[in-house]
């Protein structure tokens, strides 16, 4: 009895190019290598809410900070007195100082300080106060200040003069 070997020729070149595979000759015949398995779905980074003990409870649905891996995202803070949750008197100078003190408490609760801050976004209600804002800001970031954007806005909660948010990295 005769043996017949049937060889099927598959048109795979277009498919191989499409999926990034190629033909490989082997001793047993020809085979198509398989595309690499997709990368495993990354596990979401663990995140932890950061809420300092001495911090104004505004009753609003947000966390003062979220620590995700080595990155701390700090919510925008007004110059609120932690004891009363009201704006401190004294205009943009006092509000800027208190907002930065409040942000410092969030940094501290996450085991960081102002040296860990890599980005700041400041919202001010009137650019005529820009230089006064900068004077207080320099007290906290005197050398190697982080990247920053300062934006004038039409209004802030409670009629505040300034709101500051940050990102810090360990």
Which residues does each PLM region occupy?
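N-terminal presequence-like segments and the immediate start of the first folded domain
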Residues: 3-101, 105-118, 124-170
